[in-house]
């Protein structure tokens, strides 16, 4: 009986983790991969759900194990998605005019594509650096910015599509 509970628990974790990854893939425009994962996901769901529901009155622990698997699956799906880092992002950096030029140079030396535009702050002129990159490079780019000893305001946005650009083609 313990192995049956373990099966329900781990199968539900796998199903929900796949659901999380499928959702991310589809929202990022990866329809084919999302659909393939969806097929596997729903196959697992049908098997596990039908086996839990078939004897739930006689063995209500199945329901608890199923719910625990669901909870852990959500967590695991998020962890896996963070590791895969599928997709693209935009990093906007606002800094002083002189620091902006220096930071753009530092980033370009790290093979990061940077667009620099003039911006106007409350007190002084600023530079805004716009960076489009793969999500896998997020931490590396932010570490480079923070390690440059330049006072900068950084914002990061997930994006779905970028046409053209430097260093982000599939």
Curated annotation (Swiss-Prot):
It holds the Pfam family DUF5698. The chain crosses the membrane at residues 1-21, 36-56. It is a multi-pass membrane protein. Belongs to the UPF0316 family. One of its GO terms (cellular component) is plasma membrane. Keywords: Cell membrane, Membrane, Transmembrane, Transmembrane helix. This is UPF0316 protein CBO0591/CLC_0646. CDD domains: YitT_C_like_1. The keyword Transit peptide does not apply.
């Amino acid at each position: 009986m313990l192995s049956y509970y373990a099966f329900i628990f781990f199968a539900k974790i796998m199903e929900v983790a796949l659901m999380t990854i499928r959702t991310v893939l589809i929202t990022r425009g990866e329809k084919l991969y999302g659909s393939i994962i969806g097929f596997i996901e729903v196959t697992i769901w049908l098997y596990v759900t039908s086996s839990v529901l078939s004897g739930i009155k006689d063995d209500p622990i199945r329901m608890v194990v199923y719910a625990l698997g669901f909870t852990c699956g959500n967590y695991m799906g998020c962890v896996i998605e963070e590791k895969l880092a599928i997709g693209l992002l935009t990093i906007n950096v606002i800094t002083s005019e002189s620091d902006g030029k220096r930071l753009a140079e530092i980033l370009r030396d790290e093979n990061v594509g940077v667009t620099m535009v003039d911006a106007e702050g409350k007190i002084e002129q600023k530079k805004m650096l716009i960076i489009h990159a793969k999500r896998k490079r997020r931490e590396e780019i932010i570490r480079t910015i923070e390690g440059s000893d330049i006072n900068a305001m950084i914002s990061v946005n997930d994006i779905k599509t970028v046409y053209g650009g430097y260093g982000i083609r599939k």
